[in-house]
């Protein structure tokens, strides 16, 4: 199984650290969060089966926006990138399985888009992701509403959380990449220069609570990439 993943999957992990508290409330959508009680481990799906949410009880949120295969006729084809990020759903499910098996019944939150990226891309802003179609807009809203529910749960029960967005890159070097909202040119900077880029990174709050500098969090001996 591990060999299969090595040959077939190229992942970009986008780490978004969720800081909790009134001054730094994390938000993903202005849509109201459903007032529904969920059971950790359950999979909640909308009535069409287009968007799914595996309910969690940890400060870990995983999003899988680009591995859907459904192509409803009511959704016109989108313009722009539409490549499927194959196996990202499998990676999320395997992570959830092993995490649960080794943590005495704990679950990460996982949000799945089951619709083909050629029809819906919830990883973009709504105009580009749904492109004005009323049906696509509805599913886009459901995806982000589930995501907001997960964020609200993390904020309610934990001091901080982390969001892992599983997508695909097309680089010739087929390795797992960690995305921090920093460009390649940013990463070519010296440590002293890179330290000034903390605020624009998706892991700025990790750096804020770390005893290491921002540059060390990104590429030091104890950075996320060394785990």
Walk through the language-model features, giving the residues of each:
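Sec-dependent signal peptide recognition
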Residues: 4-12
